[in-house]
């Protein structure tokens, strides 16, 4: 692996630039590479964030199934490390993908909605 590919911050920035110019496939690749490196370094928030950004790229490309996978993985990492608000955001985007696929009545969607509701309830109870 070259030095460039080993630097998650550089890959992250390259992904942002590619995304800003509408090069979503290329951006998603940079974000995925960055996510792996962040995770290896123990930076789980940025690992989750990069998966989220890769999910956004897939969403922009209308590849909703891939976007769902990426948003779910992002949420999984976020919840595991206590970043519950971020995890909820990822799940809400996954929900948008299911809606775009016309699957808002599917069992997975109902379960996802329950999970989002429960996490939001938990977060609200922590405010006081």
Predicted segments, located by residue:
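Flexible helix-coil transition and linker loops at the boundaries of alpha-helical arrays
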Residues: 38-44, 79-84
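Alpha-helical segment of the N-proximal tetratricopeptide repeat
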Residues: 4-40
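Residue signature of alpha-solenoid helical repeat architecture, marking inter-repeat boundaries
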Residues: 3-6, 25, 45, 65, ...
């Amino acid at each position: 692996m070259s030095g460039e590919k080993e630097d998650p911050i550089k890959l992250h920035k390259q992904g942002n630039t590619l995304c800003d110019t509408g090069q979503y496939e290329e951006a998603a690749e940079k974000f995925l590479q960055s996510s792996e490196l962040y995770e290896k370094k123990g930076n789980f928030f940025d690992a989750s964030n990069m998966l989220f950004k890769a999910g956004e790229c897939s969403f922009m490309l209308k590849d909703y199934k891939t976007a769902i996978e990426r948003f779910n993985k992002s949420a999984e990492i976020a919840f595991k490390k206590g970043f519950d608000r971020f995890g909820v955001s990822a799940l809400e985007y996954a929900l948008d993908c299911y809606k775009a696929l016309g699957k808002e009545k599917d069992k997975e969607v109902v379960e996802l909605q329950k999970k989002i509701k429960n996490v939001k309830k938990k977060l609200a109870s922590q405010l006081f």
